[in-house]
């Protein structure tokens, strides 16, 4: 059984029988498939808690953060987005 959990408008968690997969949503810019969404694999994780850590790590490295307080705010914002996504899956 595989899963697909949308985390905000930028991330998607998928899985296969062995691992959880962190993907970033991207849009094809040129060619026949211009405008179509595709998933760029960021990493493979054996446990969901490791994926969440990877998501936070990757998000922090790609965000424009200039202070520790801004980093804390960004992590908190991401945690709320994750919480809402996981609540939606439960329903």
UniProtKB/Swiss-Prot annotation:
It holds the Pfam family DUF5405. It comes from the Viruses. InterPro entries: DUF5405 (IPR035404). To phage P2 ORF83. This is Uncharacterized 10.4 kDa protein in GpA 5'region. It comes from Escherichia phage 186. The gene is CP83.
